[in-house]
């Protein structure tokens, strides 16, 4: 028992198994774990993880990882932001409640909540570390962060409600402007972790990536993309698709969802952005692989255009 607790203290994946023995495996969880370990090692990470919905990302990013991080570093400060404050506060409550369980205290026996600061959106450890939960637009003046977590800071309503075309740049100006204001809250050598599904080339991730490309001297963002379906090619050159989390979502189920979404107005950009993390393919007028044809003869028929 003591050995397993010691392992969970140092290894996030073993901590998850300790807290949730029925947790499903998944390749994308290995990617998240690797990123979390880099942050725990003190690397000042600027990391974007774009991942399809319903993949357990928030459970790990906004709940289990902060709980583990606070246990490892009870003097540090964590700031967690979602599109609305209530979501981040709910995660704060879950972490707070987890910290008072025997399972958690077996792993981190010396870490406790401070008696005078236990609200779900603002609490402290007995080592004066802090957790603060907020939403886009929340006031963060006077607060600092060693770890800033941005989890799905764009709401589905603002991105898709009634829209047949991809959202415009203006739809995301408020979130972008607010993000600029919280950068001053980050401590030296602090890390920023942005985990979200893509919505548009103008969303926060799109702008961060674009800013990095235009200004090489600025912080360069590492981007990890985890789509719902992964394109595979067999030895004969035939294309097929496989679910990236077959333990939970079968390939058949994801293909059916894709076809259902594609059949609806605006479904193409929704699928390509939200599920495939490819907002560059968010227009239904873009060429698709199905449009291409092969000719066995050495010269093709007469063409209107040659690319």
Model-derived features: positions:
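N-terminal accessory segments
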Residues: 1-45, 302
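Walker A/P-loop
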Residues: 44-64
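Residue-level preference for the first positions of well-ordered beta-strands
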Residues: 46-48, 77-79, 130, 147, ...
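Walker A/P-loop NTP-binding motif
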Residues: 61-73
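Conserved nucleotide-state-sensing and coupling region of NTP-binding domains
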Residues: 77, 81-140
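Conserved RecA-like ASCE ATPase "motif II neighborhood" in helicase/translocase motors
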Residues: 121-178
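ASCE P-loop NTPase helicase motor core
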Residues: 160-234
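ATPase catalytic-site recognition across NTP-hydrolyzing enzymes
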Residues: 233-307
């Amino acid at each position: 028992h003591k050995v397993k607790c010691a392992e969970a203290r140092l290894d996030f994946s073993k901590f998850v198994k300790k807290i949730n023995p029925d947790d499903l495996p998944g390749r994308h969880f290995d990617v998240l774990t690797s990123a979390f370990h880099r942050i725990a090692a003190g690397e000042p990470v600027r990391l974007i993880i774009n991942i399809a919905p319903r993949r357990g990302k928030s459970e790990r990013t906004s709940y289990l990882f902060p709980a583990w991080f606070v246990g490892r570093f009870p003097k540090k400060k964590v700031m967690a932001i979602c599109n609305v404050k209530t979501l981040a506060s709910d995660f704060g409550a879950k972490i707070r409640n987890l910290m008072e369980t025997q399972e958690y205290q077996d792993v981190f026996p010396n870490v406790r909540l401070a008696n005078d600061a236990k609200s779900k959106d603002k609490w402290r450890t007995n080592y004066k570390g802090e957790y603060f939960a907020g939403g886009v637009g929340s006031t963060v003046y006077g607060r600092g962060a060693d770890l800033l977590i941005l989890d799905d800071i764009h709401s589905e309503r603002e991105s898709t409600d009634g829209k047949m075309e991809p959202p415009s740049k203006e739809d995301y100006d408020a979130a972008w402007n607010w993000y600029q204001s919280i950068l001053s809250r980050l401590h030296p050598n602090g890390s920023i972790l942005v985990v979200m599904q893509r919505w548009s080339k103008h969303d926060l991730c799109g702008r961060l990536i674009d800013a990095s490309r235009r200004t090489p001297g600025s912080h360069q963002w590492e981007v990890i993309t985890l789509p719902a379906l992964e394109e595979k090619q067999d030895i004969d050159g035939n294309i097929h698709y496989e679910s990236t989390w077959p333990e939970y979502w079968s390939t058949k189920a994801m293909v059916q969802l894709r076809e259902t979404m594609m059949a609806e107005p605006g479904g193409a950009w929704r699928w390509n952005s939200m599920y495939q993390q490819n907002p560059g393919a968010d227009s239904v007028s873009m060429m698709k692989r199905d449009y291409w044809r092969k000719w066995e003869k050495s010269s093709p028929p007469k063409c209107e255009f040659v690319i």
